[in-house]
């Protein structure tokens, strides 16, 4: 592999968060019964005419502005012709020669280096349906709920040189669409997905090698592993004197391999031509200026501000700014209690643990910034220990209770009365003479044993600092 350079480009599809589809009024809501959100337009019935969703145009333009694209004042829809069971019209409505956005870029960080990745174009298109293959039955079903859902396809230049760079680019792109509010970024549900074009060339060569397109990449991990495997596969072929075939390959996440799916089509295979049922999109200067003026703070700018204003590490800032609701939650909590690093630690630790375990999102949880800020405050004030705070976090997350009232009702307030703790320390020392002798003989690591025994006697409520202080003085 040392003699080859990988050349990678990504085609990213982001489903737009519009209430209705791109060319009809059917709902875009995920999870409905099969074929519940289907009308004559998205089913491709003869004689029906599409009506463009204006909000989808706005969302596409906002994305273009966010990544430094030229937003074309005029763009045209084209028919992309191919046959597949989940494409009832026999063609996809996309854009070809005149897309809505062109010539942008996105800066990514890999290690200590910053690299600029070119964005060739962003275009609007409608999504296809979904084929469902029933196990054990010699039959496939077609669900057209997704047919006609608005997408933007974001096509990168072939500027990526490793799987790591590809994942960094994809994460940065996802953070932008989420912050803009134009896509929920859910890779598992397919609302944010990508295809990767991978080829190899001898190091120092200018010409590109033959590329393979990788599909079925529905997580960052799959993107990383599929590209790494494909690079290795192509390198082995070239080393053996074989040729790489231009084809579309499917990633098998169980076997961690890519398998041939079909020959890779060229643009002429789709016989693009302007859609006669749709007039060109015209965007005037006033509307474009309005969209530019109302663009929210973008993830990279927010990340840099979190580092400079709140003293967060690059890694912590990156995680907190990956999701818009997390970033806003963090800032709201810091406004209530000005301890940004402690707030960040609570969010990246216990809060993220609960979200992961319950498979939910912050937006629909009962936890509020006021509660998290108060929890950090009462730990700092010594009202409860950090351990108690961690132990009760799950209940606070579930019921949305305010921490101070909750711990007082449960009798969990930390014991900071020196005499009460001293009594527990004396009892532990008296009950464990062998351990005391061993400790005084040099086995100082036994202090954790004594601390644990004291905490057990006080049901975890003793102030840990006082426990350690008293043990140190009494054990000598």
From Swiss-Prot:
SUPFAM superfamilies: GatB/YqeY motif, Glutamine synthetase/guanido kinase. GO terms for molecular function: asparaginyl-tRNA synthase (glutamine-hydrolyzing) activity; ATP binding; glutaminyl-tRNA synthase (glutamine-hydrolyzing) activity. InterPro entries: Asn/Gln-tRNA_amidoTrfase_suB/E, Asn/Gln-tRNA_Trfase_suB/E_cat, Asn/Gln_amidotransferase, Asn/Gln_tRNA_amidoTrase-B-like, GatB, GatB_C_1, GatB_Yqey_C_2, Gln-tRNA_amidoTrfase_suB_CS. Its EC number is 6.3.5.-. It catalyses: L-glutamyl-tRNA(Gln) + L-glutamine + ATP + H2O = L-glutaminyl-tRNA(Gln) + L-glutamate + ADP + phosphate + H(+); L-aspartyl-tRNA(Asn) + L-glutamine + ATP + H2O = L-asparaginyl-tRNA(Asn) + L-glutamate + ADP + phosphate + 2 H(+). One of its GO terms (biological process) is translation. Keywords: ATP-binding, Ligase, Nucleotide-binding, Protein biosynthesis. Heterotrimer of A, B and C subunits. Belongs to the GatB/GatE family. GatB subfamily. Allows the formation of correctly charged Asn-tRNA(Asn) or Gln-tRNA(Gln) through the transamidation of misacylated Asp-tRNA(Asn) or Glu-tRNA(Gln) in organisms which lack either or both of asparaginyl-tRNA or glutaminyl-tRNA synthetases. The reaction takes place in the presence of glutamine and ATP through an activated phospho-Asp-tRNA(Asn) or phospho-Glu-tRNA(Gln). This is Aspartyl/glutamyl-tRNA(Asn/Gln) amidotransferase subunit B. It comes from Nitratidesulfovibrio vulgaris (strain ATCC 29579 / DSM 644 / CCUG 34227 / NCIMB 8303 / VKM B-1760 / Hildenborough) (Desulfovibrio vulgaris). The lineage of its organism: Bacteria, Pseudomonadati, Thermodesulfobacteriota, Desulfovibrionia, Desulfovibrionales. The gene is gatB.
């Amino acid at each position: 592999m040392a003699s080859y350079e990988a050349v990678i480009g990504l085609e990213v599809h982001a489903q737009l968060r519009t209430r209705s589809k791109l060319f009809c009024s059917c709902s875009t809501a995920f999870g409905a019964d099969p074929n519940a959100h289907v009308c004559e337009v998205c089913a491709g019935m003869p004689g029906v005419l599409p009506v463009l969703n204006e909000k989808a145009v706005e969302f596409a333009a906002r994305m273009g502005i966010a990544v430094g694209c030229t937003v074309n004042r005029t763009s045209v829809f084209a028919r992309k012709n191919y046959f597949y069971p989940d494409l009832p019209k026999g063609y996809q409505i996309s854009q070809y020669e005149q897309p809505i956005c062109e010539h942008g870029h996105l800066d990514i960080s890999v290690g200590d280096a910053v690299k600029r990745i070119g964005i060739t174009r962003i275009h609007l298109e409608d999504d296809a349906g979904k084929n469902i293959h029933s196990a054990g039955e010699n039959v496939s079903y077609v669900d057209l709920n997704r047919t006609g859902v608005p997408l933007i396809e974001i096509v990168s230049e072939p500027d990526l040189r490793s799987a790591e760079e590809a994942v960094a680019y994809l994460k940065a792109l996802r953070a932008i669409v989420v912050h803009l509010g134009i896509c929920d970024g859910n890779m598992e549900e397919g609302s944010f997905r990508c295809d990767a074009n991978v080829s190899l060339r001898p190091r120092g060569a200018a010409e590109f090698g033959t590329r393979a397109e990788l599909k079925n990449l529905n997580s960052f991990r799959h993107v990383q592993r599929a590209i790494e495997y494909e690079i290795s596969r192509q390198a082995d072929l070239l080393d053996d004197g074989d040729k790489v075939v231009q084809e579309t390959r499917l990633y098998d996440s169980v076997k961690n391999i890519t398998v041939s799916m079909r020959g890779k089509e060229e643009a002429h295979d789709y016989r693009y031509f302007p859609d006669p049922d749709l007039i060109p999109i015209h965007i005037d200067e006033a509307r474009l200026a309005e969209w530019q003026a109302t663009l929210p703070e973008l993830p990279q700018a927010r990340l840099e501000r979190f580092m400079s204003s709140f003293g967060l590490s690059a890694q912590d800032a990156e995680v907190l700014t990956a999701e818009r609701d997390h970033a806003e939650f963090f800032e709201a909590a810091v406004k209530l209690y000005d301890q940004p690093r402690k707030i960040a630690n609570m969010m990246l630790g216990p809060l993220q643990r609960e979200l992961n375990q319950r498979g939910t999102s912050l937006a629909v949880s009962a936890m509020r910034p006021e509660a998290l800020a108060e929890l950090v405050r009462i730990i700092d004030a010594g009202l409860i220990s950090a351990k108690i705070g961690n132990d009760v976090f799950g209940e606070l997350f579930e019921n949305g209770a305010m921490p101070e009232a909750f711990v007082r009702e449960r009798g969990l307030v930390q014991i900071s009365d020196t005499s009460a703790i001293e009594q527990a320390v004396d009892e532990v020392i008296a009950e464990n003479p062998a351990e005391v002798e061993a400790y005084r003989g040099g086995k100082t690591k036994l202090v954790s044993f004594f601390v644990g025994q004291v905490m057990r006697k006080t049901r975890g409520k003793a102030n840990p600092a006082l426990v350690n202080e008293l043990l140190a003085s009494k054990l000598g």
